[in-house]
Every structure is written in C-alpha cells, then in structure tokens.
Amino acid sequence: LTSDQVAELTILIRDVVIECVGEQKASDVFVKTSTGFYKPEDGGHGGASVDDVSIMSINAGPLKVKASGGIYSREDLEKMVDAGASRIGTSAGIEIIRGEKANTDY
C-alpha cells in the first residue's frame, strides 16, 4: 500500500470504531499494522514498517497502534515504539528480552 492508502485506511478504521463504540471507548481499541504472515514479492519481510506505524499513529487517534510482524530485535521494537506503536506483536519476545536477534523464516 502507498502512504496515502495507509493513512486513508487508518482513518476509515478509526471512524468506524468511533461510530460503533464511541470516542471514549475507542481509546481502548488498537489498529494493527499487519499479521506478518506473508512474503512480499521483493523478498523483504511481511510485517510492520516504521513508516506505516508513524502514519497510522498520526491518523489513528484516539485508537492506539499495534505493530505486528517483522519485529525480531530490541532495535526493531524501539523503532516501532518511537514511531508511535503502543503495543508490539512478535514471536521473538524471549530473544528480544535476552538482547538477541531472532532468526525466523516467516
């Protein structure tokens, strides 16, 4: 998706959530970047990108952003938090806590 499409989808999700649960409860809802369970044609990882998390964070309020997929190290995690993620989805939690970089093929 393009940056504009990420922003538009985030705004759409935000508006639907606010319409359904109200603005006060919307702050309990997360908009999620991706599942991470796909491989792009360019061979990169199919997870969250710092740019997408930043765009989503700017446009999601009052919803929070969950960065999911492609987060395999403490450095990856810190970049996502700095970009605006409030929650991290990763299969590498133990490795991140140990200060290691996880090796995974999905």
Model-derived regions, located:
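Alpha/beta enzyme core
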Residues: 1-65, 73-96, 103-106
